[in-house]
């Protein structure tokens, strides 16, 4: 919770700096040597619990007002932080039922805070394995599942949780002290404890449940199957859009554009052109 308490204050300061320039503050008049209207540039003098910061910011406001605030974190405190500040929330749902409830909950939390739920977009992570046909995609998946090695999983888990997963035997139960020392993506730890049904899961439990370094919950199929999956999540709704994870490089994004995008466009679910010049415009974030 301390990390998020600090983050709350940090974001408040950053937004204060970005908003210290009004949209029409710039004059840029060489004849008068006037760069900006001083009445439209305000001073920030923040002295808080964790940070002190003084403004105004040293650069003018950007064309999109300020960069889009993107957040990832699905713990209870992380969701409250997202509801308060995030304009794009990065999520990874295990299934549609969970996603539908989580989506509604996060939007409701934003409303409770006084935000327009349309000012926050939620993007669900998918790992597509796509080909011209479902059979070809299944063959591709079979080949991909031969590739992971145990050392990669341990390395990625160690990175995510700041714990040396190579320091213990794979099937030895981790101690309470081991589990308490894990930091970083603590949702991983909590999900493993819940998913394994053990208060002291083993390292193998972490590998099997988190699927780090492996093909985790892939969406496998031809254009129709992958588009069906995305359409169901989008229209239920369980998300406002998607983050496409690369399951193989090179090739994932090329195959997705070749096979899936035309099908989504045919269904009227994906744009044929861009909404504007900025990320904010293209996300539809107000």
Q: Where are these predicted regions, by residue range?
A:
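Active-site region of glycoside hydrolase catalytic domains
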Residues: 1-56
């Amino acid at each position: 919770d301390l990390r998020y308490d600090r983050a709350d204050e940090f974001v408040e300061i950053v937004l204060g700096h970005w908003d210290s320039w009004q949209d029409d503050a710039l004059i840029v008049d060489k004849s008068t040597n006037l760069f900006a209207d001083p009445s439209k540039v305000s001073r920030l003098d923040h002295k808080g619990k964790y940070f002190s910061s003084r403004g105004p910011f040293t650069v003018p406001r950007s064309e999109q007002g300020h960069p889009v605030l993107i957040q990832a974190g699905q713990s209870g405190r992380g969701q409250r932080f997202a509801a308060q500040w995030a304009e794009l929330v990065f999520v990874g749902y295990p299934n549609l039922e969970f996603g539908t409830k989580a989506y509604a909950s996060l939007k409701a939390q934003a409303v409770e805070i006084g935000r327009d739920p349309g000012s926050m977009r939620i993007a669900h992570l998918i790992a597509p394995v796509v080909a011209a046909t479902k059979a070809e995609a299944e063959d591709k998946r079979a080949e991909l599942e031969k590739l992971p090695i145990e050392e990669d999983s341990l390395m990625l888990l160690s990175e995510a949780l700041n714990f040396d997963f190579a320091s213990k035997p794979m099937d030895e139960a981790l101690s309470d002290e081991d589990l308490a020392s894990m930091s970083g993506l603590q949702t991983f730890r909590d999900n493993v404890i819940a998913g394994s049904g053990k208060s002291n899961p083993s390292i193998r439990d972490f590998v099997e449940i988190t699927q780090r370094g492996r093909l985790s919950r892939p969406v496998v199929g031809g254009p129709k199957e992958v588009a069906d999956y995305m359409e169901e999540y989008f229209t239920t709704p369980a998300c406002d859009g998607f983050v496409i994870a690369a399951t193989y490089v090179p090739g994932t994004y090329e195959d997705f554009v070749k096979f899936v995008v035309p099908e989504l466009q045919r269904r009227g679910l994906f744009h044929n052109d861009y909404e504007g010049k900025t990320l904010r415009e293209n996300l539809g974030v107000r």
